[in-house]
Amino acid sequence: LEKVRYVDAKVAFNQRRHFFSDWAEGDHKVVSDITAQLSPHTVFVNKQLNKKSNGDPIIATVKITPRVISYVPTRFIDRALLKQLKTGDYIGIYSSASGLDVTHVGVVIREGEKVIFRHASSQRKNLRVMDVELFSYLQGKSGIMVFR
């Protein structure tokens, strides 16, 4: 996880990959964005990561970064797409906010035909790592990005 979240696995704020899509970008990318390979319904959105609607940065010490974000809308996530997911794939829950790529991140765990979303819940009643079926978790969410 340190290798994924931090450039050269150096745990420091200035080495942190602050946005999910940072993991698959640049000279130090550690995963590949496979989202578009999973569905013909993939949507591509131009975003200005770290930019608030008023133009200010969300995180003052992090630069605003233009990026094309790909995601599969939830309504197109079906059995065929779920069958392509593998244990260890990273799932980002797409954010419609202009300065963000995702709202939450987790890892795929396959249990036979079940696709489990392992994530750290921030809900007050949970505050722990949880396993939930991905399809159920996605109800009411915009869509997903998938990295491998």
Predicted segments, located by residue:
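Intrinsically disordered, low-complexity boundary segments flanking structured domains
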Residues: 5-7, 77-81, 131-135
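Generic hydrophobic, helix-prone segments enriched in Leu/Val/Ile
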Residues: 72, 85, 136-138
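C-terminal soluble interaction/assembly domains
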Residues: 91-147
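Short linear motifs in intrinsically disordered
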Residues: 81-83, 107-108
